[in-house]
Regions:
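ATP-dependent carboxylate-amine ligase
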Residues: 1-171
Length: 171
C-alpha cells in the first residue's frame, strides 16, 4: 500500500511543489512551469533545488522572448550563523548554475550571492520580496521554468503568488 500511496504524494505548498501557470488559455503552450520552494532554505536544500531546476526542460517558441529559460529567484537563507554571508556567496560556485539562464536575488543576504555571480547569470537584486514582485511580469515569460527558493522569513512566497497572478493556474 505504501508503494501505491507514494505515487499520489504531493509535497506541501512551498516545499518543492510544481505547478503550471497558464498565462493565456487561448494560446497553446503559453505557460510558466513554477517550482515553489519558498518555505525553507539552507545551503544543502538550495543545492538540491538548483539541481532540480537544472534538470528541468524549458519550452522554446512561445512567449515574448521565444527561448524558454531556467530562472532561479532566490531569497535569503536565514539563521545560518556568523558565516551566513560566505554561505550565500558560495552558491555562486554551485555546479548546477551552469545550466541556468538567469538568477535573480532577493534580500540583503542574497546581495552577497548577486555580487559573486558570473555576469552572464546575474539578474536583478531586490531589497525585499515586495520589490521583486513589482518587477515579476518583465522577469518571466511563457516557456520558462521558474524556481522560487528562500527561507520563509524572506517572504519569497509572495513572489510565487505574484507569478500565479500573472495568469490562470493549472495544477
Amino acid at each position: 500500500q505504501a508503494a501505491l500511496d507514494i505515487n499520489t504524494w504531493v509535497p506541501p505548498g512551498g516545499r518543492g511543489t510544481r505547478e503550471v501557470v497558464v498565462l493565456d488559455p487561448a494560446v497553446s503552450g503559453d505557460t510558466i512551469d513554477l517550482i515553489d520552494d519558498a518555505f525553507n532554505a539552507n545551503p544543502t536544500s538550495m543545492t538540491a533545488s538548483l539541481e532540480i531546476l537544472a534538470a528541468a526542460k524549458p519550452r522554446d517558441g512561445v512567449g515574448r522572448i521565444v527561448k524558454g529559460r531556467r530562472i532561479a529567484i532566490l531569497g535569503d537563507m536565514l539563521e545560518l550563523g556568523p558565516s551566513e554571508f560566505e554561505m550565500h556567496r558560495a552558491i555562486a560556485h554551485d555546479k548546477h548554475l551552469q545550466k541556468l539562464d538567469i538568477v535573480h536575488c532577493v534580500g540583503p543576504r542574497m546581495q552577497h550571492l548577486h555580487a559573486a555571480l558570473p555576469e552572464a547569470l546575474r539578474g536583478i537584486w531586490a531589497e525585499d520580496a515586495a520589490a521583486m514582485c513589482v518587477q515579476i511580469r518583465k522577469l518571466v515569460d511563457a516557456g520558462d521554468v521558474v524556481l522560487v527558493k528562500g527561507s520563509k522569513g524572506s517572504k519569497v512566497s509572495t513572489v510565487v503568488d505574484a507569478i500565479r497572478k500573472l495568469g490562470h493556474r493549472r495544477a
